[in-house]
Amino acid sequence: MKYLDKFFKEVLRMYPLVPFVMREASENYTFKGTKVTIEKGTKLWVPAYGIQRDANIYPEPEKFDPERFNDDAVAARHPMAYLPFGDGPRNCIGSRFAQYESKVGIIAIIRNHKVDVCEKTKIPYESDPRSFMLALKGGVHLKITKVKN
């Protein structure tokens, strides 16, 4: 289960459901050592996709590597470097349910099936620029074959 958790987190790092998190400043904030201030009430868009693809935070960000989520690696990163469900008091209320439901579904499939990418899937993947959420151009098509016991 631990590796499945790392796998799931890496998928959401590379392909978060939404590319940004919206917030509103609850008070004035001035960046240390500058005169730059975000005023109370200012609407902010936090670029989760950009943060989670930043090579300074995640070396080789285009590489799929579930080990980015081992305990030591997570402890070494800023807690706001991973935002697939937002964070704080306004984070996604269904995040835990969605994660558990997805993991149970994955286990149910891979337990008795082999999963391959279908030839209809375009590789390398391209993002669909017309999609509001992160989606791949042409979709992802899979071939699922039942494995004999």
Write out the residue ranges for each language-model feature.
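Amphipathic alpha-helical interaction motifs in eukaryotic regulatory proteins
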Residues: 8-12, 65, 86, 103-111
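Hydrophobic, repeat-rich solenoid/adaptor surfaces of innate immune receptors and signaling proteins
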Residues: 48, 102, 142-144
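Conserved cytochrome P450 K-helix/beta-meander segment immediately N-terminal to the heme-binding cysteine loop
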Residues: 46-73
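Cytochrome P450 heme-binding "Cys pocket" and the immediately downstream C-terminal segment
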Residues: 97-132
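Conserved cytochrome P450 K-helix E-x-x-R motif and the immediately C-terminal K′/meander segment
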Residues: 1-35
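Cytochrome P450 heme-thiolate "Cys pocket" and heme-binding signature region
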Residues: 72-102, 127-130
